[in-house]
């Protein structure tokens, strides 16, 4: 059975991806750069070198990637002063996992300050055994390193660990790491690539809880 659960944060726990999508244009404008169509989708779920690679693809090899990322996070500081809404079923799923004594971690591409802000605003930090940020790694999702580190924090192997993700890059990371990966789509629906990679798809976190209760999420799958 599943012995540990890894939660992504943006778009999975909290309804933040829609807000992030609106921040690119004003962030780039502060640097005199235009927003290029498709940037938000390409960057979603990435950080560090993975994000830098996306930015270079859109703005050329000589663009100041750190300045762009800093401008984006400066916009986020204002946008996320108020707690973002929790995704449906989050509280119920966490309560179920705690009742089953299944440990949980958050592994997000976001900066640690952002992770702490959202969790603290909702008084949720104590539910998780560890909080892991993409800024801790040179390579972020779709590289599986962040999830492999999370599994070590849980004391589980990838095969007995459930990864919950909404983004394409997150699903890619889970699959590459050998995790039991469930996609809960947010802004982008599952495509053929995602259906080849994920173990299962759920419409929301309530459905994840139901599948766990009914024994449908087995590590042997």
Regions found by a protein language model. Give the residues of each.
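Asp-based, Mg2+/Mn2+-dependent phosphohydrolase catalytic module
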Residues: 1-3, 95-98, 111-221
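N-terminal helical cap/lid subdomain that shapes the substrate entry/recognition surface
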Residues: 2-100
């Amino acid at each position: 059975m599943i012995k540990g659960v890894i939660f992504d944060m943006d778009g999975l726990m909290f309804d933040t991806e829609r807000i992030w999508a609106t921040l690119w244009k004003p962030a780039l404008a502060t640097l005199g750069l235009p927003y290029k169509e498709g940037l938000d989708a390409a960057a979603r779920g990435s950080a560090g070198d993975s994000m830098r690679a996306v930015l270079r693809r859109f703005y050329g090899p000589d663009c100041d990637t750190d300045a762009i990322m800093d401008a984006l996070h400066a916009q986020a500081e204002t946008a996320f002063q108020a707690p973002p809404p929790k995704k449906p079923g989050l509280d119920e799923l966490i309560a179920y996992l705690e009742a089953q004594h299944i440990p949980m971690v958050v592994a997000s591409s976001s900066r640690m300050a952002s992770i702490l802000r959202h969790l603290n605003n909702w008084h949720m930090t104590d539910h998780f055994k560890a909080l892991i940020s993409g800024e801790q790694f040179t390579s972020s999702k779709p590289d599986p390193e962040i999830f492999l580190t999370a599994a070590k924090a849980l004391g589980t192997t990838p095969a007995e660990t459930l990864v919950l993700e909404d983004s394409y890059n997150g699903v890619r990371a889970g699959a590459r790491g050998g995790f039991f990966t469930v996609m809960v789509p947010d802004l982008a629906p599952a495509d053929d690539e995602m259906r080849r990679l994920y173990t299962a798809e759920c419409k929301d976190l309530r459905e994840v809880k139901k599948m766990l209760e009914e024994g449908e999420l087995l590590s042997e799958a």
